[in-house]
């Protein structure tokens, strides 16, 4: 009975992918045929502090393969050493308009190496997120309990966590939230990246799940 329940749960799970490299229509079609049909997330801002000019065509390819705009997001990886966190967000949003990107949500990627000061990191985070809110960007946050604690302190709670979707990584190859542990003010996630750096369908992707 448990095995049957598990099969039904996996069959009804909503699976998708995220990509950081140019990806063709044929690759997206192949991925959809493998069951990754719910969402696609494309990198649009790089850690070098520049717009990813591959994003517009990759999104077009995803749309051509059957991913609707409603199911198409982008992610934003901030450049910490560049400073001017609010300015980066403004420049990014100008590029989104310039390239006429049609996406549902922007995910702000919170990981990696920032500064050695948690207070500085907290300030950088709020500069970035306050600018996104001021502009009116529909957004969420990508982050893990591990990086959150390292960057901001384990007790730090994001002021807008209750109204901001959370996408978290845990590479346990399990499309479920059974492993989630609260952090940063979030008591439940919206999406999980459950497997990373997969080579499939002539593309490099990460696997994602949402209920």
UniProtKB/Swiss-Prot annotation:
Keyword field contains Cell division: no
GO molecular function, one term: lysozyme activity
Gene3D superfamilies registered for this protein in UniProt: Glycosidases
Principal location class: cytoplasm
Transmembrane segments: none
GO biological process, one term: killing of cells of another organism
Catalytic center residues: 18, 109, 111
Subcellular location: Cytoplasmic granule
Domain of life according to the entry: Eukaryota
Entry GO terms, CC: cytoplasmic vesicle
Listed EC numbers: 3.2.1.17
Protein family (similarity comment): Belongs to the glycosyl hydrolase 25 family.
Role according to the record: Has antibacterial activity against Gram-positive bacteria. No activity against S.aureus. Does not appear to have chitinase activity.
Official protein name in the record: Lysozyme 1
Primary gene name: LYS1
């Amino acid at each position: 009975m448990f095995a049957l329940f598990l099969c039904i749960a996996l069959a009804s799970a909503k699976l998708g992918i995220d990509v950081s490299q140019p990806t063709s229509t044929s690759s997206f079609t192949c991925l959809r045929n493998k069951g990754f049909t719910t969402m696609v997330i494309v990198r649009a801002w790089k850690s070098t502090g520049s717009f990813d000019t591959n994003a517009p065509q990759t999104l077009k390819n995803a749309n051509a393969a059957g991913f609707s705009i409603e199911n198409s997001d982008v992610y934003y990886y901030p450049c910490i050493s560049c400073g001017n966190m609010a300015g980066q967000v403004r420049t990014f949003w100008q590029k989104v308009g310039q390239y006429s990107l049609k996406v549902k949500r922007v995910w702000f990627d919170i990981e990696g190496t920032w500064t050695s000061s948690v207070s500085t990191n907290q300030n950088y985070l709020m500069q970035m997120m306050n600018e996104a809110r001021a502009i009116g960007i529909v957004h969420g946050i990508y982050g893990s309990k591990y990086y959150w604690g390292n960057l901001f302190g384990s007790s730090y709670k994001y002021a807008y966590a209750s109204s901001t979707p959370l996408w978290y990584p845990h590479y346990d190859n399990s499309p479920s939230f059974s492993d989630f542990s609260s952090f940063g003010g979030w008591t439940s996630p919206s999406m999980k990246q459950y497997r990373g750096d997969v080579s499939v369908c002539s593309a490099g992707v990460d696997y994602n799940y949402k209920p």
